[in-house]
Amino acid sequence: MEYKSIEKSIVRESKVRNVFSKVCKKELFYTNLKVNSASEELLKSSKSLFAYPSSIGGGSCLSITKLSNHGKVPDTPFCIKGHTDPISCFEFSNFNDYVIATGSRDCTIKIWEVPEEGLIKDNLVTPLITLPKQQKRVTGVYFHPSVDSLFMSSTLDYTLDIWDLSSTGEQSSVIQKLTGHEDLIMSVGWNTWSGGDKLATSSRDKKMRLYDPRSQSTPIQTISTHEGAQGFKLCWADSNGLELICTVGANKSAQRQLYLWDPRQLQSSQPLVSKDVTTDSSILSPYYDFGTNMVYLGGKGDGIYYYEIEKNNAHHIGKATFGNVTQSAITLLPKSVVDVNICEIDRFLRLTAANSVEMVSFMCPRKSQLFQEDIFPPCPSGDPTTDCSLWFADKQLKVIPHTISMKPDGVQSIYEVSEEEGGKSKEKDKLEQLSKLSIGNSGSGGGGGDGDGNGGDSPFITEGIVKQEIEGWLFNSYENRYLKIVKDKIYCFLNEDSAQAIWDSPVLNIKYVDIYDEDENTSGEEWSLRFNIILLNGKEHRMECSTVKQRDAWCQSINAYREMKQQVDQSVVSPTMGEFHLVNTTPVAPSPMVISENKNALQKFSVPSPKEQQQQQQQGSESPNSTTPKSSTPTQTRHHSVLSRNPSYTSLKSSGGFSKPSPSSSTSTPPSTFASPLSIAQTSSTTTTTTTTTTTTSSSSTPPPLRANNSTSSTPLNSSTGIKQSDIVIEGNLTELIPGLLWNSNTEKWYVVSEGMLYSYKNKSLKQLDPLETIHLEKAISAHKTKEIFTIQGFSFQLSTPNRIIHLLAKTKEERGSWLSVLRQNLKSSGETKPKSVLTRASTMDELISSPMSDDESNTNEGGVEEEEEEQPLEGQLSRKLPGIFSMWGQCFVALLAEDLFVSRNKLSTTPELRIQLSSISLIKKISPNEFTLYDSMNQVVCNFRTIAPTAEFDDCTRWIDGLEAARKRSIDIIKMFGINEKEVLSPLPSSSSIPSSGSNGNLLDPSADDLTRYLDLTAIKNGKQKILIQVKGKRKIRVRMVKLSTSSLNCHNSFILDAGPRIFVWAGSKTSRVNKAKALDFANRIRTKERGGKSTLIQLDQGRDEQSFDFWEILGGNSSDPIATTPTPEEQDTESIKTTIYRVGLDVKKNSLRARLAWEGTDWKLPNKEILNTKFVYVVDCVTEIFVWVGKESSSIQRKMATKVALVLQAQKDRVDWTKITRLTEFGENNLFKEKFANYPGMLPISTTRQEIKSHVATSKVEHKIETLASRMTTPFIDNEALFTIPIDEGGRVKVWKIEDYEKIDHPQHLYSQFFSSDSYIVLYTYMQNNKEAHVIYYYLGRDSSINEKGTSAYLTVDLNESLVGACVQTRVVANKECKNFLNLFKTKMVIHKGKYNNYDPKKPSLYQVKGLDKIDIRAVQVEFSSSMLNTLHVSILRTPEKIYIWHGKFSLDAEQNSALSIAENFNSTSAPIEILKEGSESNEFWSAFESTGGRQKYFNDIMIQSSSIPTSFTYKPRFFVCSNASGIVEVTEESPFSQDDLDIGSVCILDVQSHIYLWIGSRATHRTKRASMEVVLNFIETSKLGHSKEHTKVLIATPFEEPIGFKSYFRAWCTSKYPKNKLPLVEKDGIPVEQVLKDYLKEIYTYEELLADPLPAGVDSTKLDTYLNDEDFEKVFKMTRTEWLKIPAWKREGIKKELFLF
């Protein structure tokens, strides 16, 4: 068997190869900049600011602009003024966005702090720190990326000064002066992500220098680089396993070049990689992105080049160009500013030649909505790791920046979602990264590969067959074992199918991996194939591989997993490299840099002698860290930082969002001259030997000495599983059946499922110790319910592995369902089955039980008895012929589990006696009526079984044979059966084998002449290049299939469809039935409309009548005189059946292999259901004369290629007709011919004469609620649970309002923010702080009279606005008169709604507003019709005239309304008109004269109406509104709050309850049942109400639509008649009718025949049941039969009789 490894694609895989650039919109440009273009540096930025040298003051000023202030910069921008000569260099601090350092030609260096409150104050002239004046001009200023107060400056004396800024002002001193440069220093770079202790510089003397500034002032390495006279610039690329230096310069021919150097191997004068970039003359600067290993090159010119860096290559991805607008400078913004929601990986500022600054974003296209953590690792938080004094004191201290996650709140990471759902495995990601970095390394384990990383095998292996040394009595032997690495453990199994390991060990408990030294290998080749795994406790596992390559792969893989799983503790060097760390793998002498770095470590780390190693093994775990040096960090006082926003170093230790900083000296790295953990190549300088436990081996020779294959000894961990609670999917108590010799026992254990493993413990308290046993669920075969296993109460189920059966018992049915659901997701076959819903990880069972499994069990399994389950595996008691001379028969229990047949002694057995894999069975033969035999592929007997004797009612033997045969067919791998080479599928298909492009299949090749003979191309058919003939055949079962394109296919009994693209012919035989013709015509018409968009012409032809269509006969290759077949007849066709077979091609994600299995088999008499097709698979549908390849949307490319191979093999079968073609279809792009192959495909033709399958999914009729139940709903008051979080505008709420106009959002005038117009729609953005972050709510407000277009526009513009915002955002739809409380709170006591549109608004026109509401938040003014009839004594009204504003207080209006009315009137009083307050009854003539234009003083709902009522009105009762409807099939009563006039629906009955009155507004289209029920409910409610209702104090009135009484309308906000039908105007108000008068008509049950013929019908009569109102005597006279005889007549016939008698 070939060992399984991580596959490497032929095409170079890259996460960023499709990165593209995008310039921001013009409105986000920064313009009107006055830049001193003569300055050496032109542009720098922080997260909040950007700076540029200003031309003001002769270049001695530095202009600062906020990144949030887009647009035109003021003519006099904010500047830093403090130098007398032009500024030559400047740099922002890494720890404070508002701190910047400047250097000038006046030889001064100053540190400034820009005020955070804004840049509108006076210019900044007082620096924070002024350093001592230099002797020569300052050329550069730099901050350390991790160390606080460490500052550097370079001058024209060609030195680099390092300052400690802890002591402020002139006391700041140079603590180190780096010398050795011979010309101007052009750039400086720190190894930010690999320790922060090395410094590289580039100089105009064409040399690069490396410094260890804490050890010496002179360079530890100097190397010549680019030959160009202009010099070069550099940066470090030292994240994600890289440790490189990138330099960008030019050669003598002015060709710009990119070099990659290994800082550990600089003794070679040649770079690792050299790439030509461009011939432009400008100097390019490199910018490194630590998250994606990309390097951007840019400067003065016309673009930005970007490369992806690998260990041995730099891949050019692209160039960002900007047309004719050239740039003067660029700067990379901090990583934390990018928008991860749109996959923006980097953002630059670009200073153009037109003195404007543009933002340029680089984006990586990803479709998923998940957080793409693989390209967005934690970024620097902006806080220091340590300070200057501590860093200089400890020369072994390595520091990296503090990091914080970039994941937005509420978004899942791509690593938190399964691969089946579009997620990624972090483990695989890291291993693939390690694989890329290892390719090309020296040594036998490297695996090779070309320079581009486009080929070669991966050096990593995850599972495979090896041999292990097994101790024997006389000698040891090597036996086959199956080794596998899973997560953080290595497991050794007896074979590949075993579910329980022989031994296992955490990878961190492996001390090292040894191989035998090749130089000492004198005993033969066998030693070169072996490696030893030595554990920390001294235990050793000796393994042997089949090849050296496999041995090397295992050694490197184990070490890679060890490095990747190192805990992030006090020894972490970098959060990016904390999971793995690469050391030097090249067998050359160490560079001076390495010697300097490790000169002290060489004394602390030495290779232990054999005696020392033996002592260490004897000590075991007593002193596991004996070789680990202790931290020697001195204790010093932390000085206060003047630069950092967070000066407290100790506070950072408890900062949960940051990576923990610590000195690396706590666990120092041994010298890099040791062997790499990822390479087993022997170096020339080190050969380590160890002694091992002496054992007797099968070879007489002595093994050569072992060579250590690692560089560090890991810290031992607890040998327990160390399961994290967050990784646990399910856990709980289960009872396991333990068989015994005499009786069985039931043992309770604590089971845990985590990361594909099932662990068992004695109890929960021992969960952190070693488990009793570990079962790999991916090796398990089946998990299903059982019965009659346990004798105690519970719900049993069974987990089956290849060599064991585990019987378990849960306490509840729901608990068992949850366990089965989890177990089945991890089974052996789950990798290719339909994915289940992902369970939420939880620590308790209650949280897991979300949807119990369907089960019809109704008892609690007392005595182990359950009811019959819906799906029971094939199992039972059989007799098996035992092997032996006498061939005896023995009883056994046989169960078919998945694709395996388990034979056990009895049902309670836990170990099967025999396991038969059905994939190895070639024949199941029935020997006798109750005996059958299984044969293998060699026709050898596998097993004989005997069943009970068959009876007339039951044949058990046939049942077993049919069940086993079906399972055997499903187990066959079609790929192997057809002899398809799976490796060929992984390579690109040749063009001759490519399926042609068709419709939605644009990613395939264009069809060639050969393609059209083998494939059906839907596009070619549409264009007329291909033609097909379709037959519609059958009588009882009409079927559609494709036949040969020839006149010989025609039959006089059938219809045929000739699809010629632009023309579709329908030819009907002379004896074709009408049903057959109808289906053919319908099918052809569907092709025309659905597939051709109605552009094809439909031509109908009948045999013997329309024979002059020469085109039809020409296409078929014949003429109308050709004889037409008369056989087979429709009856004979019905006896025919065409076999249909569906194969499913799946990808087993667990084994990374393809599987093609039989999914369905039958004939066209019983078609499969569409649900068999799953989007994650590809299906090959074989219909004998047609072959379809159906491609699921979520299937992989290799699945699609394999399906094509399977289809081609099927097409090439000998018994296949030569005109069979293959059609490729994508999901949702199926053609009509394919849909006809399924029974229930949407859009299938309904014409069929066969009996349809009876489904059990018929909706059951609902039971009507009792009147008392509906009435009780009205007694429960409505409670508004909306929590208030908004802040009104007047109190500081941040609100922005837009109005929708011409499909765009237009800024609403700010002074009208609380005023809206009923014919407009709006978007209101509210911004607030949530958890110290900005959050947003977008309300899109739909005016009551706004158009549908405006309402739709507001919705999609809200989505656009949401996408442009940063932070949490919620979208809320707000409808007029039903506004939510938080929206109203924004405009508290200010909100006004005017009639009409804003553009037509005339503030001088007289208008009337109704002020209504329950409290200050709910109160608002709504404009009503300008008529005195709209006044309401219950509320306040505002009358606005050009001369004066009147506030009219209704006699019974609320105080809150009266107070708010004044505030509202002042709000829209734009003309400063006087305001007069009037009370009802004391109005002036001037007030009433304002209404003269609309009829003057009219009747309105006044105090007299209330006082004259016989029933007193309650003014404290809140009106309530209910809707009574039977839309759901039964009568329901629901409360609406808030309610409005728009809730009145003519198809329902609406109930308005104001306590003193209850109005029933009966819609004209409400059903009879609803009307009657609503009246009965109200009357019952009054009798049972505890809210103050009673028959004496509550009057129930019926209101008619469009004739509502004035009292009814007065309780609605701003009642209007604008939406009334024109035939109902002018209004006629009618008083309400007492409900008792109406209800008595509905309760009347008997009417005469003459009364039922009246038009209109009597009130209360149900027009659909007129026959039920006749008494028995009249009924017999009218219908001439009794009611009993009437009910026996079918319903459809009864309707016809009723129509004849006009009772309908």
UniProtKB/Swiss-Prot annotation:
GO molecular function: actin filament binding; phosphatidylinositol-4,5-bisphosphate binding
Compositional bias annotation for Acidic residues: 854-873
HP domain sequence ranges: 1641-1704
Membrane topology: Peripheral membrane protein
Subcellular location: Membrane; Cytoplasm, Cytoskeleton
Gelsolin-like repeats: 1025-1119, 1138-1241, 1293-1390, 1404-1494, 1520-1615
Ranges where the record places region Disordered: 439-460, 606-721, 848-877
SUPFAM superfamilies hit by this protein: Actin depolymerizing proteins, PH domain-like, VHP, Villin headpiece domain, WD40 repeat-like
Gene Ontology terms: biological process: actin filament severing; actin polymerization or depolymerization; barbed-end actin filament capping; positive phototaxis; response to other organism; slug development involved in sorocarp development
Alphabetical UniProt keywords: Cytoplasm, Cytoskeleton, Membrane, Repeat, WD repeat
Span of the signal peptide: none
WD repeat segments: 82-122, 133-173, 180-221, 225-271
Pfam families assigned: DUF1899, Gelsolin, PH, VHP, WD40, WD40_4
Residue intervals passing through the bilayer: none
Domain PH, residue spans: 459-563, 727-828, 871-969
Compositionally biased tracts (Gly residues): 442-456
CDD domains hit by this protein: gelsolin_S2_like, gelsolin_S3_like, gelsolin_S4_like, gelsolin_S5_like, gelsolin_S6_like, PH
Domain of life: Eukaryota
Biased composition (Low complexity): 613-636, 651-701, 709-721
GO terms under cellular component: actin cytoskeleton; cytoplasm; endoplasmic reticulum; Golgi apparatus; membrane
Known function: May function as a linker between membranes and the actin cytoskeleton.
Record's protein name: Villidin
